[in-house]
């Protein structure tokens, strides 16, 4: 009986040691600099963590270094921050360049769609073959996802379509003027376009790629150096816990009031209808999957990009992910 009791106590101790532990009163907070986008969904998650003190709950104090997405992704490589928001495809490029990155927690799905005018005759993405389409630059994750979707439909994004590269605002203007038939667009801009009554979604990237690969494409994760992950496991656990709490709040709708307070600043949503639609879309785009099955789905998406020549071959893609 005593032996069984000792085994039970040991089991409880081991279980507790694997769980994130909230900080005790008076315990010093460990500073963590994280590069992230100042606006949009990545910026929103960062603001939510700060506002709700989800970081200090686990003994860390996150300072968000606001940058554009490309700059943020390279901040760890340049030694400017300990961690950074980045796309898995960016992590692949960083590993190839000699910066050994590990992804530790999910943030958001792609949220991208092919958007057309409401009265456009197109019923499928394939119907756009040979047409002018507005797309992001070839080096972006948004372009990467569009190329993978085309490949899976036995099309070539570069050969079968007339790509017109542009930034967000210019893409919307191109569609408004009728200079392209469709644009690759992301949230919250897609929501605002659809809410105007003039446009519709032709193809949702997240739905399409989940149907093909078993999970939506991850647009943003938190990346750290392999050395940091190996030497500071408690810190990694704390960062993951803060982000997991934020994602849980979003998925369960507990951030309703906070979203409304940030809708204009971070998403440029103004009317009650836009805010309501944006809230639902933000909830849907919060990424809450992790683990082996999820990693395999993302690896297949990345491998498709490698086959297209959009990404370098770095060997075993499983090494990117921290379970």
Question: Which residues fall in each region the model found?
Answer:
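Positively charged n-region of N-terminal signal peptides that target proteins for export
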Residues: 1-7
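Bacterial N-terminal signal peptides
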Residues: 7-17
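Sec/Tat signal peptide C-region and signal peptidase I cleavage site
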Residues: 19-25
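Short, glycine-/small- and polar/acidic-enriched structural segments
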Residues: 26-165, 174, 181-187, 202
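Short, solvent-exposed loop/beta-turn-alpha elements that line the ligand-binding surface or hinge
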Residues: 53, 57, 207-215, 284-293
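Pocket-lining segment of extracytoplasmic ligand-binding domains
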Residues: 89-90, 164, 169-263
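Secondary-structure end/capping motifs
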Residues: 229-310
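Hinge/cleft segment of the Venus flytrap/periplasmic-binding protein
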Residues: 310-323
